[in-house]
UniProtKB/Swiss-Prot annotation:
Coiled-coil parts of chain: none
Protein name: Small ribosomal subunit protein uS9
InterPro entries, sorted: Ribosomal_Su5_D2-typ_SF (IPR020568), Ribosomal_uS9 (IPR000754), Ribosomal_uS9_bac/plastid (IPR023035), Ribosomal_uS9_CS (IPR020574), Ribsml_uS5_D2-typ_fold_subgr (IPR014721)
UniProt key word Chloroplast: no
Protein family membership: Belongs to the universal ribosomal protein uS9 family.
GO cellular component, one term: cytosolic small ribosomal subunit
Pfam families, alphabetized: Ribosomal_S9
Region (Disordered): 105-130
GO terms of molecular function: RNA binding; structural constituent of ribosome
Residue ranges of the TM segments: none
Amino acid sequence: MAQVQYYGTGRRKSSVARVRLVPGDGKIVINNRDWEDYIPFAALREVIKQPLVATETLGNYDVLVNVRGGGYTGQAGAIRHGVARALLQVAPEYRPALKSAGLLTRDSRMKERKKPGLKGARRAPQFSKR
């Protein structure tokens, strides 16, 4: 018998996460590694759990993630977005809880590009009066 799986794609900065939710005991696997090994910061692990906590489904689903691009923060945000979208496929009645927590919105903030004549995106070269 084929097992039921729910899919969601999340994006944040330059990271893209493909998330699968499978009914289980709450294991989280990121790129075939345990999530505690993959993401060393407890605060970012809390970010990943937010959609499951908001819908009170923590421990009901195994979360299998394939994520690429970006750094720890971008990847954690992408996984959070993907988990929230996958939970909508599980049960559409989770939408109000996820929406009020702001978990369905794609965070569109990106790194601002460096401009010519400047040292960074906005930082100007040092100014000398004389």
